């Protein structure tokens, strides 16, 4: 114990002093002892004030940096083509969610409820991309979970708590950051229960998972092992509060449009002025989905309690040929721009003719994979060229047209010394 922090009074008793401000134990209310040091109650209060001020400054900085709904929509427009209705819904919901978090620091009688989001739309319509773009814009941790791999605790498969463990991994186990992150749960429609009536037998990958997710998405303190899973039961668990984590659930919900049609037919018509015919177009299906009600989701197989915890529902349209062509060329990280960049690294210009773009879009529509299939098609078409190109010299340009996409010819190679089109095999 340091001598300058101790002295003796006339009666022989030791007088203790605060190691920080130097006041004696007689000048303060409380002196707390540590290893070779002491701290008084006044210094503790001062430390608390300093920390509180820093937290308030951070909170004010976060408030000023939170983008407005219009700003969120502008960024989404740069990466996601179409889906204006869904993007506007998401922009408002995300803005309100983070405003709600800020309001919790204020002394207010009104507590704002949490609004998680459900995205309904066909495969490849942009559900995952929307969630990823939002997380990148807001600079918060983001993770994707597959609902089909989840099971109830005690069964083979992933616990729902593993979702939070993945989120922690994304931010190097910074609990505070994770508690303000975004979780996207994909294929949520695949955990619908098998019938509308409550199951008598155990449904560990359907209704059981929905029950397990209830508390997590509503807000609970989840105990998460740093190393994950059930394999290390003796580890010290991290406590993560999920009440401020934004959960976005997405699924294709194939057949949901028929459930909506049936409800509207029984009610004597369909809302939003949509008339459903047997020869209904894909665009009409999108309009039908836009009229989804909680009762439709319950009939589809989601339990009422789960639907109640996803109050914001955004529907996405199936992409047509025109939208797919735009996706190929317009976004900031468009597929054609990425491949052009790759070829540029070899000092070669890559050109996609308009008929080639339309052919790629038609192929993707036939495969029913939406925008997700576009990259695969372009990758296969250019594979041999990308294999040969680094070994060849004198090539200045590669041209792709409709015949190339339809596998009727190879990409056209234009040489610096030979301006005419020459097939790549020659």
Curated annotation (Swiss-Prot):
Biological processes per GO annotation: cell division; proteolysis involved in protein catabolic process
GO cellular component terms listed in the entry, alphabetical order: HslUV protease complex
A GO term for molecular function: protein dimerization activity
Ligand binding (Zn(2+)): 18, 21, 40, 43
Keywords on record: ATP-binding, Chaperone, Metal-binding, Nucleotide-binding, Zinc
Pfam families linked: AAA_2, ClpB_D2-small, zf-C4_ClpX
Gene3D superfamilies hit by this protein: 1.10.8.60, ClpX chaperone, C4-type zinc finger domain (6.20.220.10), P-loop containing nucleotide triphosphate hydrolases (3.40.50.300)
CDD domains named in the record: RecA-like_ClpX
Positions contributing to ATP binding: 122-129
Domain ClpX-type ZB residues, every copy: 6-59
InterPro entries reported in the protein's UniProt record: AAA+_ATPase, ATP-dep_Clp_protease_ClpX, ATPase_AAA_core, Clp_ATPase_C, Clp_protease_ATP-bd_su_ClpX, ClpX_bact, P-loop_NTPase, Znf_CppX_C4
Record-stated family: Belongs to the ClpX chaperone family.
Quaternary data: Component of the ClpX-ClpP complex. Forms a hexameric ring that, in the presence of ATP, binds to fourteen ClpP subunits assembled into a disk-like structure with a central cavity, resembling the structure of eukaryotic proteasomes.
PANTHER family documented for this protein: ATP-DEPENDENT CLP PROTEASE ATP-BINDING SUBUNIT CLPX-LIKE, MITOCHONDRIAL (PTHR48102:SF7), ATP-DEPENDENT CLP PROTEASE ATP-BINDING SUBUNIT CLPX-LIKE, MITOCHONDRIAL-RELATED (PTHR48102)
Matches recorded under HAMAP family: ClpX
Function description: ATP-dependent specificity component of the Clp protease. It directs the protease to specific substrates. Can perform chaperone functions in the absence of ClpP.
The name this protein goes by in its record: ATP-dependent Clp protease ATP-binding subunit ClpX
Organism of origin: Xylella fastidiosa (strain M12)
Gene responsible for this protein: clpX
């Amino acid at each position: 114990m340091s001598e300058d922090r101790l002295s003796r009074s006339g009666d022989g008793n030791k007088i203790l002093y605060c190691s920080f401000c130097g006041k004696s134990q007689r000048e303060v209310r409380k002196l707390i002892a540590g290893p070779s040091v002491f701290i008084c109650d006044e210094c503790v209060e001062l430390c608390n004030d300093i920390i509180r001020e820093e937290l308030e400054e951070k909170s004010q900085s976060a408030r000023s940096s939170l983008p407005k709904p219009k700003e969120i929509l502008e960024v989404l427009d740069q990466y996601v083509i179409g889906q204006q209705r869904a993007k506007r819904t998401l922009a408002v919901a995300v803005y309100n969610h983070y405003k709600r978090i800020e309001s919790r620091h204020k002394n207010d009688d009104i507590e704002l409820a949490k609004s998680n989001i459900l995205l309904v739309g066909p495969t490849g319509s942009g559900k995952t991309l929307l969630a990823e773009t939002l997380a990148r814009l807001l600079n918060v941790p983001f993770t994707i979970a597959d609902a089909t791999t989840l099971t109830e605790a005690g069964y083979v498969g992933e616990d729902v708590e593993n979702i939070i463990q993945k989120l922690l991994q994304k931010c190097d186990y910074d609990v505070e950051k994770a508690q303000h992150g975004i979780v996207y749960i994909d294929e949520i429609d695949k955990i619908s229960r098998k019938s509308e009536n409550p199951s008598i037998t155990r449904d560990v990958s359907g209704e059981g998972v929905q029950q397990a997710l209830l508390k997590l998405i509503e807000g609970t303190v989840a105990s998460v092992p740093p190393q994950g899973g059930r394999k290390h039961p003796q580890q010290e668990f991290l406590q993560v509060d999920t009440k401020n984590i934004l959960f976005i659930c997405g699924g294709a919900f194939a057949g949901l449009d028929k459930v909506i049609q049936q409800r509207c037919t029984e009610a004597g018509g369909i809302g939003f002025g949509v008339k459903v015919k047997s020869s209904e177009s894909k665009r009409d299906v999108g309009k039908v989905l836009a009229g989804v009600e909680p009762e439709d989701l319950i009939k589809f197989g989601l339990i009422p309690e789960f639907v109640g915890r996803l109050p914001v529902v955004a529907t996405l349209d199936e992409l047509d040929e025109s939208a797919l062509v735009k996706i190929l060329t317009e976004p900031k990280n468009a597929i054609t721009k990425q491949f052009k960049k790759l070829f540029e690294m070899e000092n070669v210009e890559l050109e996609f003719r308009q008929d080639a773009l339309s052919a790629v879009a038609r192929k993707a529509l036939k495969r029913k994979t939406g925008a997700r299939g576009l990259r695969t098609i372009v990758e296969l078409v250019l594979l041999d060229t990308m294999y040969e190109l680094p070994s060849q010299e004198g090539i200045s340009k590669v041209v792709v047209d409709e015949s190339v996409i339809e596998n009727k010819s190879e990409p056209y190679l234009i040489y610096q010394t030979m301006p005419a089109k020459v097939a790549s095999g020659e």
